[in-house]
């Protein structure tokens, strides 16, 4: 953590390293960030939300892609401070507004794009930093999807970044994401996959090696279902 804050973390999708404070999740698994950088944006995207911004890396990538206004949120005060420093370092601070809040910003127009990289494992965290990885009973994921449509333009998109590790170790059913999205008025329009390249995928002594070797990280593109869009 000391090195992450002082020497920085190299992010291939960004022009220079970012600083990560102690207690803030470090995006050392960067494979999904290339999806954020290269996936086609919704047409005429003027306003985007980065929900659970952490170090601010996703919001920074969106700003560098030319989205003129981004609102990034987090409940963690250290994350807000960390993201502020990184936005200044990358020169994107004028495009991004930070708000310390639970999930969605309080007052805003409807977004054209909402990006969220929630915790991937439905289990209980044992320390504050583990809340970035563990989500008991999928509570944060369910809350996010249950509210997303209220904050999204009818033709807007939700980009949900998730690993399928929980599905591979039988903590979630295989069709969990599309079914949960449908439950909350969203439909899947695309899914873009990438394979993680972190060291644990090659560690044969890891109890989860077999699952990690098959792990896929996906960017799920969601949009309001037709019946919901008609009401918006």
What is the meaning of each model-derived region?
Residues 19, 97-99, 189:
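General small-molecule cofactor/ligand-binding pocket signal
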Residues 156-162:
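Conserved beta-strand signature within the Rossmann-like core of class I S-adenosyl-L-methionine
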């Amino acid at each position: 953590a000391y090195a992450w804050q002082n020497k920085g973390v190299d992010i291939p999708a960004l022009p220079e390293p970012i600083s990560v404070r102690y207690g803030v999740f470090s995006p050392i698994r960067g494979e999904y960030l290339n999806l954020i950088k290269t996936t086609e944006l919704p047409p005429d995207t003027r306003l985007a939300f980065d929900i659970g911004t952490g170090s601010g890396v996703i919001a920074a990538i969106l700003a560098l892609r030319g989205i003129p206004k981004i609102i990034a949120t987090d409940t963690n005060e250290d994350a807000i401070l960390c993201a502020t420093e990184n936005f200044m370092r990358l020169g994107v601070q004028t495009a991004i507004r930070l708000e310390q809040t639970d999930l969605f910003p309080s007052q805003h127009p409807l977004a054209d794009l909402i990006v969220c990289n929630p915790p991937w494992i439905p289990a209980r965290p044992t320390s504050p930093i583990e809340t970035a990885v563990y989500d008991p009973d999928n509570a944060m994921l369910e809350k996010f999807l249950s509210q997303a449509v209220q904050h999204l333009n009818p033709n807007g998109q939700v980009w949900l970044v998730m690993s399928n590790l929980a599905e591979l170790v039988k903590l979630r059913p295989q069709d969990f994401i599309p079914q949960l999205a449908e439950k909350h008025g969203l439909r899947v329009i695309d899914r873009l996959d990438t394979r993680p390249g972190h060291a644990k995928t090659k560690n044969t002594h890891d109890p989860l090696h077999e699952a990690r070797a098959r792990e896929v990280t996906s960017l799920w593109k969601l949009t309001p279902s037709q019946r919901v869009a008609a009401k918006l």
